[in-house]
Amino acid sequence: MSALCDPPGAPGPPGPAPATHGPAPLSAQELSQEIKAFLTGVDPILGHQLSAREHARCGLLLLRSLPPARAAVLDHLRGVFDESVRAHLAALEESPVAGPPHLRPPPPSHVPTGGPGLEDVVHEVQQVLCEFIRANPKAWAPVISAWSIDLMGQLSSTYSGQHQRVPHATGSLNELLQLWMGCRATRTLMDIYVQCLSALIGSCPDACVDALLDTSVQHSPHFDWVVAHIGSSFPGTIISRVLSCGLKDFCVHSGAGGGASACGNSSQPPSTDPFPGSPAIPGEKRVPKIASVVGILGHLASRHGDSIRRELLRMFHDSLAGGSGGRNGEPSLQATVPFLLQLAVMSPALLGTVSGELVDCLKPPAVLSQLQQHLQGFPREELDNMLNLAVHLVSQASGTGAYRLLQFLVDTAMPASVITTQGLAVPDTVREACDRLIQLLLLHLQKLVHHRGGSPGEGVLGPPPPPRPVPFLDALRNHVGELCGETLRLERKRFLWQHQLLGLLSVYTRPSCGPEALGHLLSRARSPEELSLATQLYAGLVVSLSGLLPLAFRSCLARVHAGTLQPPFTARFLRNLALLVGWEQQGGEGPSALGARFGESASAHLADLAPLLLHPEEEVAEAAASLLAICPFPSEALSPSQLLGLVRAGVHHFFSSLRLHGPPGVASASQLLTRLSQTSPAGLKAVLQLLVEGALHRGNTELFGGEMDGDNETLSIVSTPLASASLLDINRRHTAAVPGPGGIWSVFHAGVIGRGLKPPKIVQSRNHQEVIYNTQSLVSLLVHCCSASGNSEREGCWGAPTLSPEAAKAVAVTLVESVCPDAAGAELAWPPEDHARATVERDLRIGRRFREQPLLFELLKLVAAAPPALCYCSVLLRGLLAALLSHWEASRHPDTTHSPWHLEASCILVAVMAEGSLLPPALGNMHEVFSQLAPFEVRLLLLSVWGFLREHGPLPQKFIFQSERGRFIRDFAREGGAEGGPHLSVLHSVLHRNIDRLGLFSGRFQAPPPSTLLRQGT
């Protein structure tokens, strides 16, 4: 009899139920009355109908006292729990506030949450069953766990969809959890099952888990909340069992092949979405079970993602280790790969859990070989379906694993190379499969990108739907730079795939990634072949993205000024832009449209490009100069600030390049400054002024053969302290001031009393040929800037350009301001000779400046070539002439060869005056005999020049414009000075005195007739 009372599978008779907290043991008569009352539902003593509460307690009493009544009592308790759940849902429906269960207010106080009088009964049931489990877990835990789990499944299925407060099973699993865990009856059943599983978890949990999974199969998906909650408490056990159960169900419903049904049945009508994220066919028997697995694992993924990932990867490796798949393999092993693919398709959470380690899992070549062998037995149709699933999964990959997955696929699909490391070779079949996978992926991404808005009919009656996200492309947003770098490697197939992917990414993320990708390509391309990738990308995006080039240009400039773009890439970016713009201007085979648009963008950002000419890295400054030298200027005039900024930066770059690279390195800067001088008169004046000032600056004088203006006097004075510094203070006070009218304190400052003369200056001069080359480069640039634009027909007989008098005047004024600023704006009229006594200091300073900077003579020659510009250098000519007169007067040598510099300066000075039409030809040729004369004779001739200029002052109003030649000339005959007068007589006297040596020169100093003067333009 006791055997009938034992639960199935019990090791031995459990004996009477424990009654530690229950009533005293019943007699046979009392037990008979309780049985009769339980069966009839009527009180045998009082004869009235038992209430639900009394009936339930009667059953609990029998459960304690009569083990054979276990099945009947447990079955009756199902109704008690069902009534309690119904009362709970009814109370929720009376609540006027809708919303999630955790946000709803508690039920009214007059209606108990567990039903009328059943809350205490539910609590007593829990106490009784828990006592049984604690007393004999091996006997009672399997029975009670099966009962409780089956009851929860029935309740979940029964009330799903019948009450508006119960969410649908296909909805949020969290809402179902919150609803049922808020019900006292279902929460009690859950606690009972958890206690059963806890009691057997260390010994034999299979009975409890099997009951859970059996119920899950029967009542899924309404039962998923139970499995999810229990899985959170026992993740290691539940996850493996759920996956195993799902795989078995998948094998049963998908047939022996394992993959055909998983990937779609060809007999079913085609779906608009080839890769559904959730089951779309309610009638398919397989879908509810695999959907339950997806829901359960998705709920557990947030906290137990590592356990799920390990279990999924274990299943994958076990399936590969089991041998080849196909029709001849074990069904569970051959269906594992399709099953895992289907799980990942239906659950983005599971895909994200695995994608992080998927690449590491597939990287060993042995794994790929095993996978290839495993799949080779599958039918072609199933392989195609699995390939389509794999394409969809890659397009849904997100996070950091997406880029790693892309790199893995591309590396695997690359053709074999002779430098492949031994042991890492990929089988050809695997390589071909990856090649096809990438091509299908690009095609699929193209469809997703260009059909993001949905079908044409969507949004007609309402707002348009939001664009569909593509997680794979979203994950690649932060890897545009890496993709561009890989593309520029120009490896076979790889750069074509990644270039196409860059185009899709640019369209998908517009307008952010398109300009960024174009900027990366332009800043990294090192050859025309690599640069063509940028032009091809632009050609593919120009239709889809408006304003692509301005955005790319602005973003790159922003990175340059922010310092995030390294100088080598900045220089390469600017050089590539210059190359594109040059292609457009030359009309060659290059992408002229791209070059023209980049030229427009560059012209709109001149203010941002100008500072790059001052970049500390020379290659960046030179690249910026190359771009600015050929990019078109805006159609409207440049603002004064923009113009001056460009001119200053261009002049600085000119001298910097001249110092570093010599004349060959200033081509771009010269072209830029020439173009700036042609923009407007203000631009011409600014270019000439800054060029002259820069050339005469102490930091650049040595480029043109000048002496470094070192303050050796100050250094020698400061080096040793003096006992008495009164005289030193006076000298400093006067010489440190701004140069003004001279005095006795500063004229002959040759040293310090008690310390001797000034130490001689240490002159470090450049190579003479280099100085000539540098000077010619500067003068050539000035000539190009001063040339009258559009007057090519007015060139001289030798093809020399006609210089603009206004431009030459600007050079002359700048010369005066640079050499002798205190005399700027002085009168142009030539003073008497006695006036030089008041300007001794200034004249000596001017003479010293000409000696230290030979470039001044070349600049005077340039000014003299455009009369009457030399008139504005009158103060310099006067000062230099006075200094030379002083020297020749003090010279005691028998000939002029002992003063080579003064001799050369005297010759150049007279020649320049003659070239500038300040002297008639007869007097202008006197410098030809200076080397044959004595110093006092040279002084006499220079005094005659002074006298002539005193009588015929160098005034611009004395010049007339000759339209035939397009220049100003001076008619000395009209002024009465064509024959030179008494000044020419001095020259003739000197010639007569040296007739034995200078007789052949007499013809050079005869005054020509007036008609000849006009014809010669002097």
Curated annotation (Swiss-Prot):
One GO cellular component, as annotated: nucleoplasm
Membrane topology label: Multi-pass membrane protein
Residues carrying Phosphoserine: S278
Intracellular or extracellular location(s): Nucleus; Cytoplasm; Nucleus membrane
Residues modified as N-acetylserine: S2
Region (Disordered): 1-26
Keyword set, alphabetical order: Acetylation, Cytoplasm, Membrane, Nucleus, Phosphoprotein, Transmembrane, Transmembrane helix
Signal peptide: none
InterPro entries named among the record's database cross-references: INTS5 (IPR040316), INTS5_C (IPR029444), INTS5_N (IPR029445)
Superkingdom: Eukaryota
Oligomer and partners: Component of the Integrator complex, composed of core subunits INTS1, INTS2, INTS3, INTS4, INTS5, INTS6, INTS7, INTS8, INTS9/RC74, INTS10, INTS11/CPSF3L, INTS12, INTS13, INTS14 and INTS15. The core complex associates with protein phosphatase 2A subunits PPP2CA and PPP2R1A, to form the Integrator-PP2A (INTAC) complex.
UniProt name for this protein: Integrator complex subunit 5
Gene: Ints5
